[in-house]
Amino acid sequence: MHTHYEEPLWQHYEFICGIDEVGRGPLAGPVVAAAVVFPRWFQPTEALLTLLNDSKKLSAKERESLVPAIKAQALHWALAEVQHNVIDEVNILQATMLAMNNAVKALPIIPSLLLVDGNRFTTDLAIPYKTIVKGDSHVFSIAAASVLAKVHRDALMCVYATHYPHYGFERHAGYPTSAHIEAIRQHGRCPIHRQSFKLRQLGEKV
């Protein structure tokens, strides 16, 4: 992947920020967002960065190898987490918006333009933005944000797995696999589970 999408925009915007999130679907843990700004007119000359794509299309090893390259080449990057209890309070959509906005606010600069993966974004920031469906497959800065968010969240869930070993978080990162649902059936929910995410498989009213 290259910066073909950003190139015409750089004529008008100096600091273009790609934003993506991971963790909307899991039954446990936080939603994590990343914001990445590459230098104006950046071209990925490092061979590793040309492999950059939607994090879901990369292996865990590929994602992890990309993280130091992204951080080294980016002008700025930031991560933000919104925890399970906040997700239960405000709903997953609002929690996702909060995470993405907080990632932008954590940057040391004010971006000129936000490029957001997906088709929906709300913000109180006075920054123009574009939503891009499948942006993590087409836009370099969004793909970079996707990788940073995914690797960060997977690492968090591996830490949680040591505290709550019955659930296999290190294998499924909290997503509703059959093994995860069976673990909830046997052991109940643990403190990092999203209480508002109900399961038909357990006879819960959705």
Curated annotation (Swiss-Prot):
It catalyses: Endonucleolytic cleavage to 5'-phosphomonoester. Disulfide bonds: none annotated. Its EC number is 3.1.26.4. Manganese or magnesium. Binds 1 divalent metal ion per monomer in the absence of substrate. May bind a second metal ion after substrate binding. One of its GO terms (biological process) is mismatch repair. Keywords: Cytoplasm, Endonuclease, Hydrolase, Manganese, Metal-binding, Nuclease. It is found in: Cytoplasm. Its cofactor is Mn(2+); Mg(2+). GO terms for cellular component: cytoplasm; ribonuclease H2 complex. Its main location: cytoplasm. One of its GO terms (molecular function) is manganese ion binding. It is an enzyme of class 3 (hydrolase). It comes from the Bacteria. The keyword RNA-binding does not apply. Residues 14-206 form the RNase H type-2 domain. Belongs to the RNase HII family. NCBIfam families: PRK00015.1-1 (NF000594), PRK00015.1-3 (NF000595). This is Ribonuclease HII. The lineage of its organism: Bacteria, Pseudomonadati, Chlorobiota, Chlorobiia, Chlorobiales.
